[in-house]
């Protein structure tokens, strides 16, 4: 039985943000929807687009919050409460400044590292930080004052290509995660570099 019951892809809603670095988490859930042939549907009570799928014989729920990033925990908290999903059964996919494009890593727990989507998710899960994170590397602009503009802009074609390769590998690892467990998926993904 899979340890993960809910996979969340963080991003900002609307066409304006669709191709920006901050939406890397959403990109992966959309990729999984295409790969495993499920449709995400708007569900107002969960403040997001949701789906239920059976992958590798395991039932899992997917969520893309339709709130802005800094309020995305509202969606995670609402769905987790409704379906009685514990923080330890949640995987949140998000963009990661501290990893280069072409790298993605899974970890459990930790702080929010300044990421407002993680910050709100932690707050909405009663300050429980013990959920899993799948961090999609987007690189860092080099100066903390440039971070906000950087995450809300599109990656260069070279960076996007590297990010896409990491997303493809991460999508393959999600199937491993659901069939064979998080340790096996983590070992494979954390050793990958595009």
UniProtKB/Swiss-Prot annotation:
The gene is pth. Monomer. It catalyses: an N-acyl-L-alpha-aminoacyl-tRNA + H2O = an N-acyl-L-amino acid + a tRNA + H(+). Hydrolyzes ribosome-free peptidyl-tRNAs (with 1 or more amino acids incorporated), which drop off the ribosome during protein synthesis, or as a result of ribosome stalling. TRNA binds at residues 17, 68, 70, 116. Its main location: cytoplasm. Signal peptide: none annotated. Its EC number is 3.1.1.29. The record marks 12 as: Discriminates between blocked and unblocked aminoacyl-tRNA. GO terms for cellular component: cytoplasm. One of its GO terms (biological process) is protein quality control for misfolded or incompletely synthesized proteins. The record marks 95 as: Stabilizes the basic form of H active site to accept a proton. HAMAP family: Pept_tRNA_hydro_bact. InterPro entries: Pept_tRNA_hydro, Pept_tRNA_hydro_CS, Pept_tRNA_hydro_sf. One of its GO terms (molecular function) is tRNA binding. This is Peptidyl-tRNA hydrolase. It is found in: Cytoplasm. Belongs to the PTH family. The active site is at 22 (proton acceptor). PANTHER family: PEPTIDYL-TRNA HYDROLASE (PTHR17224:SF1). Keywords: Cytoplasm, Hydrolase, RNA-binding, tRNA-binding. It is an enzyme of class 3 (hydrolase). It comes from the Bacteria.
């Amino acid at each position: 039985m899979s340890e993960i019951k809910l996979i969340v892809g963080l991003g900002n809603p609307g066409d304006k943000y669709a191709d920006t670095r901050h939406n890397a988490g959403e990109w992966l859930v959309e990729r999984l929807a295409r790969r495993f042939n499920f449709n995400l549907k708007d569900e107002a009570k969960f403040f997001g687009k949701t789906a239920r799928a059976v992958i590798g014989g395991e039932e899992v729920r997917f969520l893309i919050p339709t709130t802005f990033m800094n309020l995305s925990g509202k969606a995670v908290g609402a769905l987790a409460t409704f379906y009685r999903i514990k923080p330890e059964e949640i995987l949140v996919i998000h963009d990661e400044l501290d990893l280069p494009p072409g790298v993605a890593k899974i970890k459990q727990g930790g702080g929010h590292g300044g990421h407002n989507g993680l910050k709100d998710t932690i707050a909405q899960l009663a300050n429980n930080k013990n959920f899993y994170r799948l961090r999609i590397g987007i690189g860092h602009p080099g100066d903390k004052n440039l971070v906000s503009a950087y995450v809300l802009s599109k990656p260069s074609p070279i960076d996007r290509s590297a990010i896409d390769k990491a997303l493809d590998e991460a999508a393959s690892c999600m199937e491993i995660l659901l069939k064979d467990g998080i340790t096996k998926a983590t070992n494979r993904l954390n050793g990958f570099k595009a």
